[in-house]
Structures are given as structure tokens and as C-alpha cells.
């Protein structure tokens, strides 16, 4: 597997709330490691044209509220300078719906990665995909890094969920390109049809053997050298993918989960219940979502 150049431009989608602080820190860490330009994008809700004192355009200057675009831009610059005054950054603030604003800004800047945070349910004390993140992973033609963990250090471990398809092969290649120093674990979950009517142990062994052979072929087709492939941990497990991955994430070292989307996949509104989407929502740590290669060609 040939290591390509790092992306030269990434974007961070932020709502300026504390929920996005972890995504902010991760974006800075990645931008420094890749020596990439970082564009911070924030979408503002449209302002009301009428105030208690009349229409904004008709008010004297001292009665007009501060320019919200300039205020948001100044806040972002202050935060970035406080974190690292030397990083190459751009700030894009625009009025509009968040997902379209982010996607269009990413397209215009030729970004190769979108970094974003997640919403939080304070009552249930769990992190979950918000509407904006959900729309980003449906419509983006570039990978989206969903950040839940604190960004203490670079990713050391990477878990690639695979069904041995072209989509998951591209996801693996993307993960290796982005984070070449991370160790790789390959994860495949399978179900045994008619398990109650068959000799379960024997059938499961057959599926295990198939999974190991398929994993070897998968890594070879991804362009991974034999010596590198031997260093990849294989997990061929029986069960529901998102349940197994969530359990593994909660009981193992911190890692980045990498998942590819299929054809229509989670891009298709009708397939929101797909395995990929369930994995993204279930895994408690960071997730790199790599769009289906056919979608990139179409765009």
C-alpha cells in the first residue's frame, strides 16, 4: 500500500459551543501533523431585521447590535491565536443552514477532510449525532472525522470495520493515508443463517475460516505489502456489528474507528438504518467516515 501525501487542506465545522472544543483540538493536532491549512467554518442563523427600536437599516449606529459575522470571526481568531499563533488558518463565517454552508465552503477550498463534533443529550449523558453532523455524513464527498474523545495525542490505534467491499477497502486506504503510524485492526462481523437448525460450532468455524481468507485477500487488494499485512490484527466475530464494536470500544484502548459508506449507503435518505450509520452512532469514540468511491466519481 503506497503512502500518499497528506491532505493539504482540512476544515473544522463548529457551532462555537463547548461541544465542539474536542473537535477543535483534534483539528489543530491534525493540521499541525499534516502541515495543512485549516479553515474554521461557522454558520450563523439569520438575524431579525426588526428590533424593539425599529428596522436595523434605519437605526442610528449606536443602536445597532454588533455585526454577528464579525463578532463570530473575532472570537474564532482569538481562540486560535491562544492555542497556536503559528498555525495556517482561515476563518469562514456565513449566514445560513450549517450543513450546506460547511459543504460549500469545503468544496470551494478543496478540503480533503471535514472535522466536526457531536451533540450531547444532557439527560441521558451520552454523545449522539446531531442533525448537522447527520447531514454532513450523508452528503459529503470527502471523509468526515467525527470527534468524541479528547485530543491528547495522535491516533495510535485504528479499527477498520469491513464487509470486504470496495467501499471498506477505500476506507482502509484512506485511514492508512491519513494516519500511517497507527496500528491497524480489521473487524468483520457475520451472522450465521439458520443457526438453530445447523451444527452451530461447525458452521461458525466455516465462517471464521472464510473470514480469515477474505481478510487476507482484502488486505492484498488494498495494496498492503505481505509484511505489513501480517502486522494487522484480524477480528472475525459473530454478532451484530454495531453492538460488537461498541462493546469493543468500551473495553479496549482508545482508537479511531474507520467505516466506509456504500453506494446509496447513508447518503440515501431511505437507508439511514444501514449498518454504517448504526456503527457511527453506536461507537463511543472518534469515527472516520469515508464516503463511497462511486459518490466521489459522480461528483
Predicted regions, residues:
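Short, structured interface segments
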Residues: 131-150
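Small/aliphatic-rich secondary-structure junction motif
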Residues: 2-60, 157-205, 224-227, 231
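Short, well-ordered secondary-structure micro-motifs
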Residues: 50-52, 127-128, 171, 196-200, ...
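A short acidic, glycine-rich active-site loop
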Residues: 59-72, 203-214
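Short beta-strand elements of ligand-binding domains
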Residues: 115-118, 144-149, 287-291
Amino acid at each position: 500500500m503506497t503512502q500518499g501525501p497528506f491532505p493539504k487542506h482540512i476544515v473544522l465545522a463548529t457551532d462555537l459551543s463547548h461541544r465542539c472544543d474536542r473537535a477543535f483540538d483534534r483539528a489543530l493536532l491534525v493540521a499541525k501533523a499534516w502541515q495543512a491549512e485549516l479553515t474554521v467554518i461557522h454558520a450563523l442563523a439569520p438575524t431579525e431585521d426588526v428590533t424593539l427600536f425599529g428596522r436595523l437599516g434605519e437605526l442610528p449606529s449606536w443602536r445597532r447590535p454588533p455585526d454577528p459575522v464579525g463578532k463570530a470571526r473575532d472570537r474564532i481568531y482569538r481562540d486560535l491565536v491562544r492555542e497556536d499563533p503559528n498555525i495556517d488558518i482561515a476563518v469562514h463565517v456565513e449566514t445560513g443552514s450549517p450543513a450546506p454552508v460547511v459543504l460549500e465552503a469545503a468544496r470551494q477550498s478543496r478540503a480533503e477532510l471535514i472535522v466536526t463534533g457531536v451533540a450531547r443529550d444532557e439527560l441521558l449523558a451520552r454523545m449522539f449525532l446531531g442533525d448537522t453532523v447527520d447531514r454532513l455524513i450523508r452528503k459529503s464527498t470527502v471523509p468526515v472525522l467525527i470527534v468524541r474523545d479528547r485530543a491528547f495525542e495522535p491516533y495510535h490505534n485504528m479499527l477498520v470495520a469491513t464487509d470486504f467491499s470496495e467501499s471498506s477497502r477505500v476506507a482502509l486506504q484512506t485511514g492508512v493515508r491519513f494516519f500511517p503510524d497507527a496500528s491497524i485492526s480489521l473487524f468483520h462481523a457475520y451472522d450465521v443463517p439458520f443457526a438453530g437448525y445447523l451444527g452451530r460450532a461447525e458452521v461458525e468455524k466455516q465462517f471464521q475460516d472464510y473470514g480469515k481468507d477474505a481478510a487476507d485477500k482484502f488486505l492484498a487488494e488494498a495494496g498492503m505489502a505481505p509484511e505489513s499485512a501480517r502486522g494487522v490484527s484480524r477480528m472475525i466475530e459473530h454478532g451484530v456489528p454495531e453492538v460488537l464494536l461498541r462493546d469493543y470500544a468500551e473495553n479496549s484502548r482508545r482508537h479511531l474507528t474507520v467505516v466506509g459508506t456504500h453506494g446509496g449507503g447513508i447518503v440515501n435518505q431511505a437507508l439511514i438504518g444501514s449498518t454504517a450509520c448504526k456503527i457511527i452512532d453506536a461507537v463511543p469514540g472518534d469515527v472516520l467516515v469515508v464516503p463511497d468511491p462511486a459518490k466521489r466519481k459522480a461528483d
